[in-house]
């Protein structure tokens, strides 16, 4: 059971009190197949295939909602929501190679990920004491794919190890949301796609001199995220007409990181500085607005930007005593 008490401020002060009984029931099945082959002590390869599917998944809630405007109750109704999740598979293929040629160590990883999700939702609203009633049916499907590759070369330089490498990731997600009724108080149909490519190159160096450890690295990323509002085939030539530049993004950034560990008497000091990025998920970027009840919609925001974080950390240790201090600075935070 769940109770929600929400207050909305505007021209009208609105209070929405809701009591929920939530029910869910799902069955999942999965399978995997893989192999690993060692040629010799310097070369090995392997791959795995995994599939997941939910043959049965149902959910929903029963709720009683009371609505108050400027201190007076204006509406009371029940909402019986039933959701049937579509039985669509998720597939994941991964492969790797690990080897050594001379003094150079080679690590390669690749992945192909395919996912299909969807649900059909029924919302039956019944007004109390002669209030209006209605039944809303909506349908949502999402198809996504991703393929990625990462290569790292490691070899000794002076008294440490130098690593250089690159990564490439390309992904796409297509969303389709339809609702059986249209009106000024109902969301409309949405059909959008987001395609993103990420090309990265990085270098790092780590060494140990007596009791001092130093690790430093630099990563460069070129990210292109294109947003399309379309009902057509993404790969068709006509699809360029549906490109939305205001909701698309391009990034070119460097991400440095430095870590230094050294003793101070009987204590051990570690200092870290790094820059990281957190990008919105596909669901957060979707323009789809899902209808849950006449007062609750759920959706994303295609205008969200990536959040960049600059962080400094200090760790001081002495026997069982540990002291931590962290400083963070966020650029374009998303909460």
Show the residue positions of the predicted features.
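Outer-membrane beta-barrel signature, preferentially recognizing the C-terminal barrel domain
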Residues: 84, 190-198, 246-249, 277-331
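Extracellular loop and loop/strand-boundary signature of outer-membrane beta-barrel proteins
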Residues: 14-21, 77-83, 131-139, 183-191, ...
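Face-selective signature of the C-terminal outer-membrane beta-barrel domain
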Residues: 28-56, 80-232, 263, 267-268
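Outer-membrane beta-barrel translocator domains and adjoining extracellular loop/strand segments
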Residues: 2-12, 58-74, 118-128, 174-183, ...
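Acidic/polar loop patches that form or flank catalytic/metal-binding clefts of enzymes
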Residues: 267-272, 323
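Periplasmic-side early beta-strands and strand-to-turn transitions of outer-membrane beta-barrels
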Residues: 1-39, 53-70
């Amino acid at each position: 059971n769940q109770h929600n008490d929400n207050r909305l401020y505007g021209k009208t002060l609105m209070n929405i009190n809701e009591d929920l009984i939530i029910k869910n029931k799902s069955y999942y099945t999965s399978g995997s197949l893989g192999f690993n082959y060692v040629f010799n002590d310097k070369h090995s390869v392997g791959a795995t295939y995994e599939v997941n599917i939910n043959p049965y998944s149902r959910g929903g809630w029963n709720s009683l909602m009371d609505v108050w405007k400027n201190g007076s109750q204006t509406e009371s109704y029940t909402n019986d929501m039933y959701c049937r999740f579509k039985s669509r598979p998720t597939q994941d293929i991964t492969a790797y190679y690990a080897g050594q040629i001379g003094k150079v160590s080679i690590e390669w990883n690749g992945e192909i990920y395919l996912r299909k999700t969807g649900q059909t939702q029924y919302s039956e609203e019944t007004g109390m004491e002669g209030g209006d009633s209605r039944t809303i049916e909506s349908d949502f499907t999402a198809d996504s794919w991703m393929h990625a590759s990462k290569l790292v070369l490691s070899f000794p330089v002076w008294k440490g190890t130098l690593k250089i490498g690159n990564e490439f990731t390309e992904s796409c997600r297509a969303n389709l949301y339809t609702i059986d009724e249209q009106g000024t108080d109902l969301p409309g149909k949405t059909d959008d796609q987001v395609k993103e490519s990420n090309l990265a190159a990085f270098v790092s160096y780590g060494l140990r001199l007596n009791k001092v450890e130093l690790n430093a690295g630099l990563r460069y990323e070129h990210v292109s995220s294109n947003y399309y509002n379309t009902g057509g085939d993404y790969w068709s030539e006509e699809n360029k007409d549906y490109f939305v530049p205001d909701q698309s993004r391009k990034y070119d950034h460097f991400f440095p990181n430095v870590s230094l560990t050294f003793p101070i008497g009987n204590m051990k000091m570690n200092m870290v500085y790094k820059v990281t990025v957190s990008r919105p998920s596909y669901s957060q970027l979707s323009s789809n607005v899902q209808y849950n009840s006449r007062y609750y919609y759920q959706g994303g925001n295609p205008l969200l930007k990536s959040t960049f974080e600059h962080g400094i950390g200090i760790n001081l240790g002495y026997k069982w005593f540990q002291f931590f201090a962290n400083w963070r600075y966020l650029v374009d935070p998303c909460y």
